[in-house]
A protein has these predicted regions:
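N-terminal secretory signal peptides that target proteins for export/translocation
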Residues: 1-11
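Generic hydrophobic/packing signal
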Residues: 15, 26, 46-49, 54, ...
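Alpha-helical interaction segments
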Residues: 28-30, 54-56, 95
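Periplasmic/extracellular, small/polar-rich flexible segments of pilin-like filament-forming proteins
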Residues: 67-169
Length: 169
């Protein structure tokens, strides 16, 4: 008759215990919980920086249009501005706007609102506005940010507040 140690000798396999696997999963979960908000903030900040760059281009082109024509380009005068903005032209709201994945851009003229460039952040469905970035006639060097409704995430609210406080990112 064989003793117990002889029977189990061929089962001497090196492996992780269930506790060790649970500890690894827990550590990965904690790291993901810490890293995900930072990643989301970096992505949204990158989107906002890109929008600010395009917004400044629209404002500069609109100011050049003003010098040549004595008035700012309105919502229907997008083609008159001497700039290329990547995206598709959207005329569904009246006038011309450039729609990208994340923003809708337009020169708005200096009418009642006093904007010379406007970028509206939209969620993926593109229907509602989350926040808008704009440049006004009164202070063309400063970027302004205004939240729209309750759709903005906490990250978007913080970044918008930062832009509003500093005038840029």
């Amino acid at each position: 008759m064989q003793n117990k140690s002889d029977l189990l000798s061929h089962l001497d396999v090196k492996a992780f215990t269930l506790i060790e696997l649970l500890v690894v999963v827990l550590i990965i979960g904690i790291l993901a919980a810490v890293a995900l908000p930072q990643y989301q903030k970096a992505v949204e900040k990158t989107r906002m920086v890109e929008a600010i760059s395009i917004l400044r281009s629209i404002a500069n082109a609109n100011q050049a249009y003003y010098m040549a024509n004595g008035q700012y380009a309105g919502i229907s005068d997008l083609d008159a501005l001497d700039i290329e903005i990547p995206g598709t032209v959207d005329t569904s709201w009246g006038g011309q706007r450039i729609r990208t994945k994340d923003f809708i851009y337009s020169p708005t003229g200096a009418g009642a609102v006093g904007y010379i460039a406007l970028a509206q952040r939209t969620p993926n469905n593109g229907e509602t506005q989350v926040y808008k970035l704009f440049i006004t006639v009164d202070d063309p060097a400063r970027i302004r940010c205004q939240r729209q409704g309750q759709g903005a995430s906490s990250i978007q609210r913080k970044l918008c507040s930062e832009v509003e406080a500093k005038g840029t990112l």
